[in-house]
Amino acid sequence: MVFSSYKLPDLPYDYDALEPVISAEIMHLHHQKHHQGYINNLNEALKSLDVASATQDLTGLIAINPALRFNGGGHINHSLFWEMLAPQNKGGGTPPRHELLKLIEKFWGSFDNFLKNFISSSAAVQGSGWGWLAFCPKKQELMIQTTANQDPLEATTGMIPLLGVDVWEHAYYLQYKNARLDYLKNFPSIINWDYIESRFVEMSK
């Protein structure tokens, strides 16, 4: 089995488009260095997987799994993350409408209360990880989830990620230093709810 190589996706906006919430310096480093690094390591892991599979090296196959989970998760998470954001002059921060808003209000009482819970849960992640607004297809429910490191939400929990926030230090430290909460409080103003709502409509069918 030969796996195709993954490539870095283009951002749907310029590096400085999310300022002042996220600086151009952070966006460039995050996209070109960190995300590219996950892709490079993922492709190397897939090459090793090809060799181990061809030689039926079961020990080798098992040994590759952590690298696939970490780097594959990093690629999945960041590819979603870029799309979940939008400049403020292109709709970033505009609250959701329609069925998604109704469901948010059902589970959290109000949109503002959801944001408070999302921010507090994401701020509480110990070390590196992600905060998520997740959709459970089986129960047709929304819930707030967190994942460690680069664990991909759907592959590890079966939940569909609708909104994600990266709380690794590389996502904010150059600008916010150790004030993760300040980063998270500013984050809602660049959320692309149009994209998230379109994901919700597709995933809830």
UniProtKB/Swiss-Prot annotation:
What EC designation does it have? 1.15.1.1
InterPro entries xrefs: Fe/Mn_Superoxide_Dismutase (IPR050265), Mn/Fe_SOD (IPR001189), Mn/Fe_SOD_BS (IPR019833), Mn/Fe_SOD_C (IPR019832), Mn/Fe_SOD_N (IPR019831), Mn/Fe_SOD_N_sf (IPR036324), SOD_C_sf (IPR036314)
- Which cofactors must be present for this protein to function? Mn(2+)
Disulfide bond positions: none
Family annotation (Pfam families) = Sod_Fe_C, Sod_Fe_N
Domain of life of the native organism: Bacteria
Q: What class of enzyme is it?
A: oxidoreductase
* GO MF terms held by the record: manganese ion binding; superoxide dismutase activity
Keyword terms: Manganese, Metal-binding, Oxidoreductase
SUPFAM superfamilies with a match to the protein in the record: Fe,Mn superoxide dismutase (SOD), C-terminal domain (SSF54719), Fe,Mn superoxide dismutase (SOD), N-terminal domain (SSF46609)
Which proteins does it associate with, and in what oligomeric form? Homodimer.
Query: What does the similarity note say?
Result: Belongs to the iron/manganese superoxide dismutase family.
Q: What does this protein do?
A: Destroys superoxide anion radicals which are normally produced within the cells and which are toxic to biological systems.
Write down what this protein is called. Superoxide dismutase [Mn]
**Which species is the source of this protein?**
Chlamydia muridarum (strain MoPn / Nigg)
